[in-house]
């Protein structure tokens, strides 16, 4: 192994080999964290009820109520950081991923507006890198990033008020290494529901039967001189080559939920005719254009903020990079629906596609074959 990749545990934690001089930044972060904690210590949440939530792996979402029951609560979550090797396509391409709870994307968290999110963030000593978490739904301290820097073996607890309603990205944002961590899979989403639940913007309630979470991820896997994807012994060894690919702004893969085909075949998203489905879709880094082939977005919050009235009857919706969006659809016909990023090169060539497998009875009034294909 070359000297470039012979990083000691200490140098990796400090970021000396891969992120420049981070140690002064860590000191500044610690001082800022102490000041911020002191300023907010007067907030009394001890009297609020507490709810502990067990998160589940996407595309599924933990049990929750769509309308708040009672007043604000403290909702407790735990995320454990896991650095792990994953396979991202049928050709066996490997990536040293950085993950929350072992999945790409990390789990979707659900609370109600004005609840308090209390997150325990664990960086086990089996990891090699420093991490943190930035919630786009939070106010202050770099979205919590300044208060949650954890070295391997560290645990921290962050609490913030979910004051804005919508779906929001969260991601790792350690000093000097943000894009590397984000494009290595370290991102997820949180849904902050209005206390009265979703509405159509005209005061009418919208309720869903199912919710699925699709996390779109761009990966940047280096190739060797023969064009084959390279493999590495560790996440640190891959850093320099990965950074070169990242700087081209040209992903090797753009996938849903961590791998090409992860939400197809036996893993397709399930629904039935008449079911109302909410699709939460995040992209922490690049713009995307979700489209449900054969269906629509009955109600769409493309930038994910529920205070805004939804767009209706959408064919394709635009989600800017660093954003989560939400789309609601009532399935009307059975069959296999492809759900894609409608940059079709990214969908068909790079992997940004999923399937909905929908059961039920066919409605000839909506579509029928008048004449089957045949010779003239």
From Swiss-Prot:
Pathway: Nitrogen metabolism; nitrate reduction (denitrification); dinitrogen from nitrate: step 2/4. InterPro entries: Cu-oxidase-like_N, Cu-oxidase_2nd, Cupredoxin, NO2-reductase_Cu, TAT_signal. It catalyses: nitric oxide + Fe(III)-[cytochrome c] + H2O = Fe(II)-[cytochrome c] + nitrite + 2 H(+). Keywords: Copper, FAD, Flavoprotein, Metal-binding, Nitrate assimilation, Oxidoreductase, Periplasm, Plasmid, Repeat, Signal. It comes from the Bacteria. Cu cation 1 binds at residues 131, 172, 181, 186. GO terms for molecular function: copper ion binding; nitrite reductase (NO-forming) activity. Residues 1-33 form the signal peptide. Cu cation 2 binds at residues 136, 171, 342. NCBIfam families: Cu_nitrite_red (TIGR02376). The type I copper site in NIR plays a crucial role for electron transfer from pseudoazurin to the type II copper site of NIR, which comprises the catalytic center of NIR for the reduction of nitrite. This is Copper-containing nitrite reductase. It comes from Rhizobium meliloti (strain 1021).
């Amino acid at each position: 192994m070359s000297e470039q990749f012979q990083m000691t545990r200490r140098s990796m934690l400090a970021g000396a080999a891969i992120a420049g001089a981070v140690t002064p930044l860590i000191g500044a972060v610690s001082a800022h964290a102490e000041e911020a904690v002191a300023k907010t210590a007067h907030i009394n949440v001890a009297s609020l009820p507490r709810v502990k939530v067990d998160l589940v792996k996407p595309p599924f979402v933990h049990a929750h109520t769509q309308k708040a029951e009672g007043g604000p609560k403290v909702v407790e979550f735990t995320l454990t950081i896991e650095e792990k090797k994953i396979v991202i396509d049928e050709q066996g391409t490997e990536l040293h991923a950085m993950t929350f709870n072992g999945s790409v994307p990390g789990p979707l968290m659900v609370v109600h507006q004005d609840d308090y999110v209390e997150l325990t963030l664990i960086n086990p000593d089996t990891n090699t890198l420093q991490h943190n978490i930035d919630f786009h739904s939070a106010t202050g301290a770099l979205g919590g990033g300044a208060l949650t820097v954890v070295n391997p073996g560290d645990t921290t607890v962050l609490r913030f008020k979910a004051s804005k309603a919508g779906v929001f990205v969260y991601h790792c944002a350690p000093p000097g290494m943000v894009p590397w961590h984000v494009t290595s899979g370290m991102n997820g989403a949180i849904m902050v529901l209005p206390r009265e639940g979703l509405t159509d913007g005209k005061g009418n309630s919208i309720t869903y039967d199912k919710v699925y979470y699709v996390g779109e991820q761009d990966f940047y896997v280096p190739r060797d001189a023969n064009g084959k994807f390279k493999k590495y012994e560790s996440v640190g060894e891959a850093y320099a080559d990965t950074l070169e690919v990242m700087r081209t702004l040209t992903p090797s893969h753009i996938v849903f939920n961590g791998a090409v085909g992860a939400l197809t075949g036996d893993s397709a998203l399930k629904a039935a005719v008449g079911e109302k489905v909410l699709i939460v879709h995040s992209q922490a880094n690049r713009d995307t254009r979700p489209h449900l082939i054969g269906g629509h977005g009955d109600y769409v919050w493309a930038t994910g903020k529920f205070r805004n009235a939804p767009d209706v009857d959408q064919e394709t919706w635009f989600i800017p990079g660093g954003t989560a969006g939400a789309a609601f659809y009532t399935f009307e016909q059975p069959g296999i629906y492809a759900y894609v990023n409608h940059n079709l090169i990214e969908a068909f060539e790079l992997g940004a596609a999923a399937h909905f497998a929908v059961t039920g009875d066919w409605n000839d009034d909506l579509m029928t074959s008048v004449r089957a294909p045949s010779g003239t």
